[in-house]
Amino acid sequence: MKNEPPKVIIAMKPSLLVLIDGMPQMGDVPGTKLRSVINSRSIILYDNEKELYYLRVQDWWLQAKVIEGPWEYAKKLSDAMKKAEEIVASQNDGQNPEGGQTTQQPSLKGSKKKVEFAETPAVYVAFEPTEMIETKGEPTYSQIQGTNLKYVVNTTGNIFRRADGEYYMLLSGRWFKGGTLDGPWTFVAATDMPTDFAKIPKDNPKAVVLASVPGTPEAKEALIANSIPQTATITRSEAKLTVQYDGEPSFVPIQGTSMSYAKNTSAAVIKAFDDYYCVEAGVWFKAASPEGPWVVADTVPAQTYNIPPSSPLHNVTYVKGYNSTLDVVHVGYTSGYYGTVVSASTNTVVFGTGWYYPP
């Protein structure tokens, strides 16, 4: 697994983090002349005529001249934007930018035609792996009894400060340390973890981090839970799979193996020799063609389980078939299939391989 620190933003007022997988890739919005950013989970539109970007925040829109901001509330929408709003509302009802906190919404005062807007939240647009931790104002600290640690009280994140002034932060199960809250941050290996963290009392609000402290009973329990497979019995005749490609199936090599995977589909399709394999909902399927027809697989090539963490298909290595009959196949997967894996550096459960998979 990889343990490089992401970019970290400490936000001390209501803020939104908008993640884009690399530089913006644009697509057409059906029925309009607008464009949309297709490589982001956030709803971002671009109006060519007005030369403005629009970002949807709950039921409202922010606008900016450049995608990095600054952003402000859009007080008047064009007819094209109103039409686009209907489209995206039906397709993405309730969707928010990932990592974003719920911020104060515009309020109606006096006449129904007059809208008074709340303060615009700070919007951070990131094109690389980024984490944001929001505090309610300047950080305030509380001492953890029996340790030399203090933790930040006014945040939902996990930030600690030692007596020597060094900061520790838990992100996706990994520990990072820095001399200030502005960083730079470095990964903390198990051998460098201060012993004070294992002494956090179980009744302390921050006892939840004990599952990520190497060697603690909580960390050992998490390892056991992570290794227990979720099993199912799949009836062959009932299991169906259809794979959609963006154009003709296109395959790229999987490093460290003789296999390749389809890069133009959201499905995990692997080519091994003259056969094709695909994992869907924790079940292996097999076909003689990338378009199918697909049937439940009894076995998969051994090298499938050598797919490295650097590959976007590493998660399929946690899916297995145990045994089968003419009618059913017994399958199972451990938590790594959904991204909860074990870090060899700390022997603790972490979230994600730490690798960035470009779109």
Where are these regions (language model features)?
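N-terminal low-complexity segments enriched in Gly/Pro/Tyr/Ser
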Residues: M1-P359
